[in-house]
Amino acid sequence: MFRAAAPGQLRRAASSLRFQSTLVIAEHANDSLAPITLNTITAATRLGGEVSCLVAGTKCDKVAQDLCKVAGIAKVLVAQHDAYRGLLAEDLTPLILATQKQFNYTHICAGASAFGKNLLPRVAAKLEVAPISDIIAIKSPDTFVRTIYAGNALCTVKCDEKVKVFSVRGTSFEAAATSGGTASSEKASSTSPVEISEWLDQKLTKSDRPELTGAKVVVSGGRGLKSGENFKLLYDLADQLHAAVGASRAAVDAGFVPNDMQVGQTGKIVAPELYIAVGISGAIQHLAGMKDSKTIVAINKDPEAPIFQVADYGIVADLFKVVPEMTEILKKK
């Protein structure tokens, strides 16, 4: 039986949609936009209403110009000051609060990266609202879906806060198109630096391999590699596949590789076209960070390893024999 909505209900729904507005906090490196910001913009457009982006930094004109071309954005707000050089949460929060107050945004969001996870809880606390972390779907402007229990269950969260503050899992939303947009650009509200923290320096490891969360192919190693030196087997294979290299928490805790390579619930969430798990047993925390990969290949000598339960292809064999053989075959192609 079909029941027509009352005119008053339709007017309220239309009014609610009309007054929805979302502020996306852009993550960037001054000259380039972090890919997860494009995924976050897609999530923001699902809410309905106007989407704006806030770009804070130093000499970030190029990023602002690039964002103006992104589909789905109505306005780009730019704030440039030496205080924003390191994108510290202590300095960005007053800027975000002032911007929200000026435009009365109903939603504030950022990618669920280290940047977003550090910034948004502080913003939410200052607004006296509860943040929603790592959402994977949007059901309505006040209803979101996130994973719990290491990805084994879905939790639907209805948020009644005056301002909804949430972080977005990048792998759950397509990247917004980087062309076709015609957003306007203007200066954001100026705020005085709080000077609680001081940005000194940042030293990043240089690599010819793609960044882990944005790579189309990822090769990850676990405790089965037995040492950090043996990760060279994975580096050689990754070079042939133009892949990024990751690791399980067990490998990181054992000191084989640095923690910025960790894939899993407490590490990085990846969803590449191809994920090759080498010597990884498949703890639930690791699976939570890679199970959305399009194709999963597992190499482990233990046929009962949990990783085989999520793998599309499994190789039960000694990794120290199989991986070099794979590398040699690829070299000949």
Curated annotation (Swiss-Prot):
Q: Name one Pfam family in it.
A: ETF_alpha
Task: Briefly state the protein's biological role.
Answer: Heterodimeric electron transfer flavoprotein that accepts electrons from several mitochondrial dehydrogenases, including acyl-CoA dehydrogenases, glutaryl-CoA and sarcosine dehydrogenase. It transfers the electrons to the main mitochondrial respiratory chain via ETF-ubiquinone oxidoreductase (ETF dehydrogenase). Required for normal mitochondrial fatty acid oxidation and normal amino acid metabolism.
Please give the InterPro entries that the UniProt record associates with this protein: DHS-like_NAD/FAD-binding_dom (IPR029035), ETF_a/b_N (IPR014730), ETF_a/FixB (IPR001308), ETF_alpha_N (IPR033947), ETF_asu_C (IPR014731), ETF_asu_C_CS (IPR018206), Rossmann-like_a/b/a_fold (IPR014729)
Post-translational modification Phosphoserine, affected residues: 140
| S-S bridge residues | none
N6-succinyllysine: modified positions: 59, 69, 158, 187, 203, 216, 226, 232, 301
GO CC annotations on file: mitochondrial matrix
Cofactor(s) the protein requires to work: FAD
Q: How does it assemble?
A: Heterodimer composed of ETFA and ETFB. Identified in a complex that contains ETFA, ETFB and ETFRF1. Interaction with ETFRF1 promotes dissociation of the bound FAD and loss of electron transfer activity. Interacts with TASOR.
GO BP term, example: fatty acid beta-oxidation using acyl-CoA dehydrogenase
Q: What is known of its domains?
A: Domain I shares an identical polypeptide fold with the beta subunit ETFB though there is no sequence similarity.
Q: Which residue intervals make up region (Domain II)? A: 205-333
Q: Which family does it belong to?
A: Belongs to the ETF alpha-subunit/FixB family.
Give the species. Macaca fascicularis (Crab-eating macaque)
Q: Which Gene3D superfamilies match?
A: HUPs (3.40.50.620), TPP-binding domain (3.40.50.1220)
Residues recorded as bearing N6-acetyllysine in the entry: 59, 62, 69, 75, 101, 139, 158, 164, 203, 226, 232
Looking up SMART domains in the UniProt record yields: ETF
Where can this protein be found?
A: Mitochondrion matrix
Name this protein carries in UniProt:
Electron transfer flavoprotein subunit alpha, mitochondrial
